[in-house]
Amino acid sequence: MHFHLFYVYLRLFWRNGCNNTITRKRNTMKIKFISLASGSSGNCYFIGTDAYGILVDAGIGIRTIKKHLKDLGIGLDTIRAVLITHDHADHIKAVGHLGEKFGIPVYSTPEVHIGINKSYCVTEKLSTSVRYLNKGTQIQIEDLSITAFEVPHDGTDNVGYCIEADGKIFSFLTDLGHITSTAAEYICRANYLILEANYDEEMLKMGPYPQYLKERIAGPNGHMSNRETAEFLAENITERLKYIWLCHLSKDNNHPELAYKTVELLLRSKGVLVGKDVQLIALKRNTPSELYEFE
C-alpha cells in the first residue's frame, strides 16, 4: 500500500516537475507612486519600488522632502536620481541640496542645467551631480526606463518624462501650454498619467492677475486649463489608461474639486465613467497624495 502511494507521487513529480508542466506565477514588480507636492508653488513626485526610487522635480524645501519620504519609510539613500522637467523655481528649489549635499545624480537637458545654476533659488550650485540627457533618448536607472520628451512651456528648456517598468508606463506632463503631437504620443501610451490642469478659464479671466500674466498663463507656452485638459482626454483616452492625476493646479485660479468635475463631466459625455473605466485624482498643492502601489 505504501509502495503504491510512493509510486503515484513519483509519477506526479516526474510529470509535473521534470517535464516543467507546473504553472508558476510570474514575479511582478510593485511600482509605487506618490505626489509629495503639486502646484504652482512647488512640485515633487516619487516613483519607485520597495528598494529604490527616483524623484521627478524637487520644487519644495529639502526638509519637507525628507519628512514626507521618512513618513513613507523611504530614506534619501534609496533615491537613485532626480529628474528635472525645467528650471522654474517651483520645480528646482531643493535640487542643489539633493545633488551636492546628498550626492544624488540630477538628470536633465544641458540647457536646463545651465538654467538651474543661474537660478536665484538654487543656493547649492550643481557640479558633480550633473547628468545630461537628450530628449528622445532612453536611459536606464535600475529597472526604470526613462525617456525625456519636449513639451511647450516658457522655461529655458522643458521636458516631460515617460517612465517604464515591468510593462507599466507612467507619463509626466506637469507644465505645458498646449498638447503637441509629441506630447499626445506619450499621453496616449500611458497606463498612468500625470497631466497638468492648471487653471479654470473663468477664474483666471475674473481674477486679480495683471493682464500680461493672464495672457502668459493662457498662451501656447503657458499652462493647460481644466477645459483644455478635459477636452483632450475625452477625445483621446485609451483603454490602456488606468489612472489620471491632475497636477500643477493654480492656487489663485483653480481648486481640486473644480478641476476634477470639469474632467469627469467631459469624460462621462464620451461614455467614460470615472471610478469604473478610469481612476481620476486631482492632486493637492501642499499635501502629499496617498501612496499608490501597482503590481
Regions found by a protein language model. Give the residues of each.
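Active-site metal-binding motif and surrounding structural segment of the metallo-beta-lactamase
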Residues: 62-109
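Active-site neighborhood of phospho(di)ester-bond hydrolases with catalytic His/Asp-centered motifs
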Residues: 56-59, 80-87, 107-110, 171-174, ...
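Conserved beta-strand hairpin/beta-sheet module of binuclear metal-dependent hydrolase folds
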Residues: 9-15, 26-72, 157-175, 192
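Metallo-beta-lactamase
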Residues: 110-160, 164-167
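Cap/insert and terminal regions of metallo-dependent hydrolase folds
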Residues: 181-281
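Structured catalytic core of nucleotide-sugar glycosyltransferases
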Residues: 34-44, 86-91, 95, 106, ...
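Active-site environment of divalent metal-dependent phosphoester hydrolases
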Residues: 41, 88-92, 114-115, 156, ...
